């Protein structure tokens, strides 16, 4: 049965308009991008198959657009729409940070770091530089490494913060293993970074560790006091 033959209130697009995007399942949201679906299937069933074979949703959406375009049921047009939607989500979060919402909504900062770093196959350490009203000035990837780690140099973080005339910094890095639990090395380098920034009167507001699931926040655990 084609989706157009479904009751109106069950169709993904109509359901979204009537009840909001949160009312849709992962498959229903993905079906909006899939379009007509594969031959003999409606778009929702095609979306379910994509999630079953290439999911869960996070792993599917973390793929580059060129990879998505090769998956049965998507193709170049749908892959481009998905990639554009992901980029819009990142820019939306960044615009919120630029308006000074970095401290009023810490989970959004964690989500932003997660979107930027989670899919990397190697460790990346990044910094979000903030002005004295905690508005985002710039986001920079400062250090890259291997699947096992990256060398972090606090002096370079301080240098970049001074270059941006930042009053505060939030940093984050990913764990390619998927386990977001901070290591002893993570805690040690964060202490060095905290001390180095304090010497030039710049605050380290948080350090997020990105893996599968929810990012781990050093500030939330009281490790920056």
From Swiss-Prot:
User: What are the record keywords, sorted?
Assistant: Hydrolase, Metal-binding, Metalloprotease, Protease, Zinc
The record's annotation in InterPro entries points to: MPN (IPR037518), RadC_JAB (IPR025657), RuvA_2-like (IPR010994), UPF0758 (IPR001405), UPF0758_CS (IPR020891), UPF0758_N (IPR046778)
Where do the annotations place Zn(2+) binding?
Answer: 173, 175, 186
Domain of life the protein comes from? Bacteria
The MPN domain is annotated at 102-224
Please provide the Gene Ontology terms (biological process) for this protein. Answer: proteolysis
Keyword presence, Amino-acid biosynthesis: no
UniProt keyword Ion transport present: no
GO MF, any single term: metal ion binding
Motif JAMM motif, chain ranges: 173-186
* Name of a matching Pfam family: UPF0758_N
Family, similarity comment? Belongs to the UPF0758 family.
NCBIfam families reported for this sequence = PRK00024.1, radc
For this entry, the protein name equals UPF0758 protein XCV4028
To which species is this protein native? Xanthomonas euvesicatoria pv. vesicatoria (strain 85-10)
